[in-house]
């Protein structure tokens, strides 16, 4: 059995998957905020409960935001303060007496989608998350590409290309990102960026779901906004796809529920790619909130 954990600032979620990659059991508990000992206990107790339930010693994979293992072997995860700065992988491996694997939660999302029954035919899969931020991951032949710093797929921290400024106007404001850089595309293409763009052009403060509801009602202003957003997304993705050249692009995160993104993006992409380039197949993520757990569990399928 494959045990996959999706760990965030508020919850530790476990999914147990069988050899056919089907979910058999799941459970979640609150994430301890201050005590590392309590954090380890929470994870280990879930593993032990699963072992007893299924009568096997399952493999353990964990998806967590941040850098799963820094140069000194410790975790860096600002949203999980109880475990950040601690040798999480080594401690759990020792306590559970098995190989525990960690990866970035965005990489786990991409891995989950790459191992979908329909998508395993594609050698290079790119996962793109359009949610609170913009991130993603790359999977090549069923294995995540992580890089030495686990920042492969941090697409949101690429800067706006010159074509974006041609589209939006050269007086378009370059916003300072939380990472400290100016003009990161996350500030414009995330759910918050989607809302910020609307406020910037129309001087109305609405959340993304409210804007999308107006678009669905045929509101002309919302329609113009969505067209502008999709054009900007296509410009930025054109740069990324020219580097990555994936066979399949899977879009997740809250904005992926807005079907216009996946249905209309394909029309816009070709003009931003090299003439010889083939645009990837574009799909919405298939596994929703379960994606992080699935991908974490499947870290043990990548040998």
UniProtKB/Swiss-Prot annotation:
**Pfam families tied to this protein:** ROK (PF00480)
Keyword Nucleotide-binding attached: yes
GO MF assignments: ATP binding; N-acetylglucosamine kinase activity; zinc ion binding
**Top-rank EC class of the record's enzyme:** transferase
Per the UniProt record, which residue ranges are transmembrane? none
Q: Which GO terms describe its biological process?
A: N-acetylglucosamine metabolic process; peptidoglycan turnover
Family designation? Belongs to the ROK (NagC/XylR) family. NagK subfamily.
Name-wise, this protein is N-acetyl-D-glucosamine kinase
Q: Which organism is it from?
A: Salmonella dublin (strain CT_02021853)
What's the name of its gene?
nagK
């Amino acid at each position: 059995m494959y045990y996959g954990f999706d760990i965030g600032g508020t919850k530790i979620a476990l999914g147990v998957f069988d050899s056919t990659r089907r979910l058999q059991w799941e459970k979640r508990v609150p994430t301890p905020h201050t005590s590392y000992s309590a954090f380890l206990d929470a994870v280990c107790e879930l593993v032990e409960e699963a072992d007893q339930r299924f009568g096997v010693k399952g493999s353990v994979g964990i998806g967590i935001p941040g850098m799963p293992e820094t140069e000194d072997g410790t975790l860096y995860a600002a949203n999980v303060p109880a475990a950040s700065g601690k040798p999480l992988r080594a401690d759990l491996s020792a306590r559970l007496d098995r190989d525990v694997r960690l990866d970035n939660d965005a990489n786990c999302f991409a891995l989950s989608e790459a191992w979908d029954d329909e998508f395993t035919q594609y050698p290079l899969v790119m996962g793109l998350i359009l949610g609170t931020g913009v991130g993603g991951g790359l999977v090549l032949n069923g294995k995540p590409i992580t890089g030495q710093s686990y920042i492969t797929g941090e697409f949101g921290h690429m800067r706006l290309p010159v074509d974006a400024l041609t589209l939006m106007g050269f007086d378009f404001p370059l916003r300072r990102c939380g990472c400290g850089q100016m003009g990161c595309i996350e500030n414009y293409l995330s759910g918050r960026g989607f809302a910020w763009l609307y406020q910037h052009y129309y001087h109305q403060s609405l959340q993304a779901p409210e804007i999308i509801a107006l678009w669905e009602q045929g509101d002309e202003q919302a329609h113009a906004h969505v067209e502008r957003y999709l054009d900007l997304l296509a410009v930025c993705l054109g740069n990324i796809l020219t580097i990555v050249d994936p066979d399949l692009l899977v879009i997740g995160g809250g904005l992926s529920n807005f079907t216009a993104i996946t249905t209309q993006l394909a029309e816009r992409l070709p003009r931003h790619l090299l003439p010889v380039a083939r645009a990837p197949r574009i799909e919405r993520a298939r596994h929703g909130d379960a994606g992080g757990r699935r991908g974490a569990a499947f870290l043990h399928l990548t040998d």
